[in-house]
Amino acid sequence: MAVKATKAEKKIVYDSKLCQLLNEYSQILVVAADNVGSTQLQNIRKGLRGDSVVLMGKNTMMKRSVRIHADKTGNQAFLSLLPLLQGNVGLIFTKGDLKEVSEEVAKYKVGAPARVGLVAPIDVVVQPGNTGLDPSQTSFFQVLNIPTKINKGTVEIITPVELIKKGDKVGSSEAALLAKLGIRPFSYGLVVESVYDNGSVFNPEVLNLTEDDLVEKFAAGVSMITALSLAISYPTVAAAPHMFLNAYKNVLAVALATEYSFPQAENVKEFLKDPTKFAVAVAAPVSGESGGAVVAVAVEEEAAEESDGDMGFDLFG
């Protein structure tokens, strides 16, 4: 007859196992395991077999093992797991892609009936339609104030009814009605609550971000930094081009309003004095091969326009 291990021996074995996993893995999913049965957990372990290990245990034991590992190795990074070990949770150690592992875990959710006293994880809404129940069952609907009518010898629900709100406890009447309707409103499985990756802890929603999402958020951040920098006149890499452009505009405005000048301002002053030069300058680059001809045509057209103007004609009229 095998000798049963004592509690102290079990703790030593558990500490050894968890410390070994912490040595081998740098990625961990912290998962909630409420209402998850042993058979369901076994199926999840089989599904993740290969590059992932599921470890369950009491929070106190897990915290104890993490502290022991930190003391032995001097690696304090895993201590960030301690605040996450609250409630009925487990750890999934993995070397695979975190998003793929998270999606694999989600596949093993199973439907569950609404049991009396259970706290509803979601809103439960009963949709309108024929229930298939005979008229003698109407008392269940009347107790819950669900509008019904008799249609072809069966009870039919007329309008959608919010039977249970998220966070409320399931009552006996609600549980009985859902059972009669064959509705299993809840689904349970391991739910990823937090992600640990090489010392960083973050929300599992981050796993769903795509490269486009990251680029969009980065661009929005740069835009905000640029706007703030310009508003308070604080130089940053993002705002520098705009600051140089604004400074140039300000200096140019001063040069135009005063006798002060500089090479770039001289060009602008020349354009303002004789706009026809600006027209010629714009027309010139249109054709690289016949640039001279374009300039000549532009000048001739200007002269013709002035001549036609005296005769009451408009070249563009």
From Swiss-Prot:
Any Gene Ontology biological process: ribosome biogenesis
One Pfam match: Ribosomal_60s
Gene Ontology cellular component annotations, sorted alphabetically: cytosolic ribosome; Golgi apparatus; ribonucleoprotein complex
GO molecular-function terms, A-Z: mRNA binding; structural constituent of ribosome
Keywords linked to the UniProt accession: Phosphoprotein, Ribonucleoprotein, Ribosomal protein
PTM summary: Phosphorylated.
UniProt xrefs under InterPro entries: Ribosomal_protein_uL10, Ribosomal_uL10, Ribosomal_uL10-like_insert, Ribosomal_uL10-like_insert_sf, Ribosomal_uL10-like_sf, uL10_eukaryotes
Function: Ribosomal protein P0 is the functional equivalent of E.coli protein L10.
Subunit-level organization: P0 forms a pentameric complex by interaction with dimers of P1 and P2.
Annotated family: Belongs to the universal ribosomal protein uL10 family.
Protein known as: Large ribosomal subunit protein uL10z
UniProt organism field: Arabidopsis thaliana
Gene: RPP0A
